[in-house]
Amino acid sequence: MVPEPGPSANSTPAWGAGPPSAPGGSGWVAAALCVVIALTAAANSLLIALICTQPALRNTSNFFLVSLFTSDLMVGLVVMPPAMLNALYGRWVLARGLCLLWTAFDVMCCSASILNLCLISLDRYLLILSPLRYKLRMTPPRALALVLGAWSLAALASFLPLLLGWHELGHARPPVPGQCRLLASLPFVLVASGLTFFLPSGAICFTYCRILLAARKQAVQVASLTTGMASQASETLQVPRTPRPGVESADSRRLATKHSRKALKASLTLGILLGMFFVTWLPFFVANIVQAVCDCISPGLFDVLTWLGYCNSTMNPIIYPLFMRDFKRALGRFLPCPRCPRERQASLASPSLRTSHSGPRPGLSLQQVLPLPLPPDSDSDSDAGSGGSSGLRLTAQLLLPGEATRDPPLPTRAAAAVNFFNIDPAEPELRPHPLGIPTN
C-alpha cells in the first residue's frame, strides 16, 4: 500500500517512553477488526489448499489465483494485525525496528494483490478473445514469469524506496512522536500510485470491458446457432426423434432467453468485480494524492480508508470463486457436506450419456458437436488440423472412469464469452432416448 503522504519529512518516528496505554478504540471496533482478520486468513488459506489438493483445479489460469490468494493471505497475517493495534492504541506499540519493516510489507502485499488482479483480467482476456491460441501464449513458464514480475514490481515499489529514503526527499520537518505513519513526498506518491494502482486499474477496465462487449455480441450468435442447427446436432449424434414444430419453437425461445440471461449474468459478474475493486481501493489512492497536496485528511479518516482497502483482500477469495463452477464443485468435495452423498446418488441415477459399466461421464452440449463459424479476425489459422475449413468442429471428449485432465478443454469463441468465469454452459444437454421396439 502506498504510504500516507504529508508535509512532515522523516519516516523515523519519535517513540514515547513507558508501556503502551489501554486501547482507545471500542470493543465493537476491536471485535470487527478481529473478524475481518480471521476471515481473510481463513478464506485465502482454504482456497490455496483447495487448488493445491484438487487435481481438477491445477491449471495455468488458477496459478494466478494462487498468487492472488497468497498476497491476500500475507495482508491478513502480516499487515492487518499491526494495523489493528496501531488503530486501537493510536500509536505504534510494537518494537521500533518493526515499523519500517511493517510499512514495507504493507506496500508490497497490497500492491501485489492489485497487480495479481490485473494478471487475472489479462488471463481471462486472452482465454476468451483468443481461445485457440491461449495455450500457446499462456504457457506455465510465461505464467510464472508474469507472477514473478508482479511480485518484483511490488517489492521494488516498497522495500527499495524505503531503504534508500526516496520517500523523504524534499522534507525537513520532524515526525509525529510515537506514530508509525510513513510520510512521503508528492512525486513519490504519484509514481507509486501510478505503478501500483492507476495503470493496473486501467488495464483491468480495458480487459473486462472488452470481455463484456464480446459476451453481449456472441450471446446473440450462440442463440442463433442453437436455434438454426438443433436438427443438425440431432443428426450428428444420431438421436432419432419425432419432429414437433410447436415444441421446437418453444424450446428455441427458451434457449434464446437462457442465452440472454447468461449474457446478463456475465455483465453482472463484471459489474460486481469492477465495483468491489474500485469501491475498496479508489478512495484510498485518491486520499493519498489529496493529502499530498493539501494535508487536509484526518488520521482517523485515513485509517478508515486504509482498512477499506484491506477489505479487498477479504472479498477476493469470496467474490472470485463465487462465479467459478469448478471451485464450487471442488469445495463440495473438499469440505464435508451432509447433502453431497444424496446429490451424488441422484446424479448417478439420472438418465444421461452413461452406460451401466462406464460410470459418470460428461454430457454432450451443442458447442461440442456444432460447427461454429469464426469471424474473419479469429485465430482459426492456428488450427493446424482444420484443413482450411471455415468452421471449427469440436467432438465430444469421453473420459474413461477415473480419468481427469489437468487443464480444461479450450472453449469455443461463442461459448467462452458468455461462460468466462465457468458459469454453467447455456446449451442444453442432449441425451439419447432409447428406440422403441417396432410392433406389427
From Swiss-Prot:
<feature type="transmembrane region" description="Helical; Name=5">
    <location>
        <begin position="186"/>
        <end position="209"/>
    </location>
</feature>
<feature type="transmembrane region" description="Helical; Name=4">
    <location>
        <begin position="143"/>
        <end position="167"/>
    </location>
</feature>
<keyword id="KW-0472">Membrane</keyword>
<feature type="binding site">
    <location>
        <position position="106"/>
    </location>
    <ligand>
        <name>serotonin</name>
    </ligand>
</feature>
<dbReference type="GO" id="GO:0007268">
    <property type="term" value="P:chemical synaptic transmission"/>
</dbReference>
<feature type="transmembrane region" description="Helical; Name=3">
    <location>
        <begin position="97"/>
        <end position="122"/>
    </location>
</feature>
<dbReference type="GO" id="GO:0007192">
    <property type="term" value="P:adenylate cyclase-activating serotonin receptor signaling pathway"/>
</dbReference>
<protein>
    <recommendedName>
        <fullName>5-hydroxytryptamine receptor 6</fullName>
    </recommendedName>
</protein>
<feature type="transmembrane region" description="Helical; Name=2">
    <location>
        <begin position="63"/>
        <end position="88"/>
    </location>
</feature>
<keyword id="KW-1015">Disulfide bond</keyword>
<dbReference type="InterPro" id="IPR017452">
    <property type="entry name" value="GPCR_Rhodpsn_7TM"/>
</dbReference>
<feature type="binding site">
    <location>
        <position position="288"/>
    </location>
    <ligand>
        <name>serotonin</name>
    </ligand>
</feature>
<feature type="region of interest" description="Disordered">
    <location>
        <begin position="346"/>
        <end position="392"/>
    </location>
</feature>
<dbReference type="GO" id="GO:0007187">
    <property type="term" value="P:G protein-coupled receptor signaling pathway, coupled to cyclic nucleotide second messenger"/>
</dbReference>
<dbReference type="InterPro" id="IPR000276">
    <property type="entry name" value="GPCR_Rhodpsn"/>
</dbReference>
<feature type="compositionally biased region" description="Polar residues">
    <location>
        <begin position="347"/>
        <end position="358"/>
    </location>
</feature>
<dbReference type="GO" id="GO:0030594">
    <property type="term" value="F:neurotransmitter receptor activity"/>
</dbReference>
<keyword id="KW-1003">Cell membrane</keyword>
<dbReference type="InterPro" id="IPR002232">
    <property type="entry name" value="5HT6_rcpt"/>
</dbReference>
<dbReference type="GO" id="GO:0004993">
    <property type="term" value="F:G protein-coupled serotonin receptor activity"/>
</dbReference>
<dbReference type="GO" id="GO:0032008">
    <property type="term" value="P:positive regulation of TOR signaling"/>
</dbReference>
<keyword id="KW-0812">Transmembrane</keyword>
<dbReference type="GO" id="GO:0005886">
    <property type="term" value="C:plasma membrane"/>
</dbReference>
<feature type="topological domain" description="Cytoplasmic">
    <location>
        <begin position="324"/>
        <end position="440"/>
    </location>
</feature>
<dbReference type="GO" id="GO:0030425">
    <property type="term" value="C:dendrite"/>
</dbReference>
<feature type="topological domain" description="Extracellular">
    <location>
        <begin position="294"/>
        <end position="299"/>
    </location>
</feature>
<comment type="similarity">
    <text>Belongs to the G-protein coupled receptor 1 family.</text>
</comment>
<comment type="function">
    <text>G-protein coupled receptor for 5-hydroxytryptamine (serotonin), a biogenic hormone that functions as a neurotransmitter, a hormone and a mitogen. Also has a high affinity for tricyclic psychotropic drugs. Ligand binding causes a conformation change that triggers signaling via guanine nucleotide-binding proteins (G proteins) and modulates the activity of downstream effectors. HTR6 is coupled to G(s) G alpha proteins and mediates activation of adenylate cyclase activity. Controls pyramidal neurons migration during corticogenesis, through the regulation of CDK5 activity.</text>
</comment>
<dbReference type="GO" id="GO:0045202">
    <property type="term" value="C:synapse"/>
</dbReference>
<feature type="topological domain" description="Cytoplasmic">
    <location>
        <begin position="53"/>
        <end position="62"/>
    </location>
</feature>
<dbReference type="GO" id="GO:0007188">
    <property type="term" value="P:adenylate cyclase-modulating G protein-coupled receptor signaling pathway"/>
</dbReference>
<feature type="transmembrane region" description="Helical; Name=6">
    <location>
        <begin position="267"/>
        <end position="293"/>
    </location>
</feature>
<feature type="topological domain" description="Extracellular">
    <location>
        <begin position="168"/>
        <end position="185"/>
    </location>
</feature>
<feature type="topological domain" description="Extracellular">
    <location>
        <begin position="89"/>
        <end position="96"/>
    </location>
</feature>
<dbReference type="GO" id="GO:0005929">
    <property type="term" value="C:cilium"/>
</dbReference>
<keyword id="KW-1133">Transmembrane helix</keyword>
<feature type="topological domain" description="Cytoplasmic">
    <location>
        <begin position="210"/>
        <end position="266"/>
    </location>
</feature>
<comment type="subunit">
    <text>Interacts with MTOR, RPTOR and NF1. Interacts with CDK5.</text>
</comment>
<keyword id="KW-0297">G-protein coupled receptor</keyword>
<dbReference type="GO" id="GO:0099589">
    <property type="term" value="F:serotonin receptor activity"/>
</dbReference>
<feature type="topological domain" description="Extracellular">
    <location>
        <begin position="1"/>
        <end position="27"/>
    </location>
</feature>
<feature type="disulfide bond">
    <location>
        <begin position="99"/>
        <end position="180"/>
    </location>
</feature>
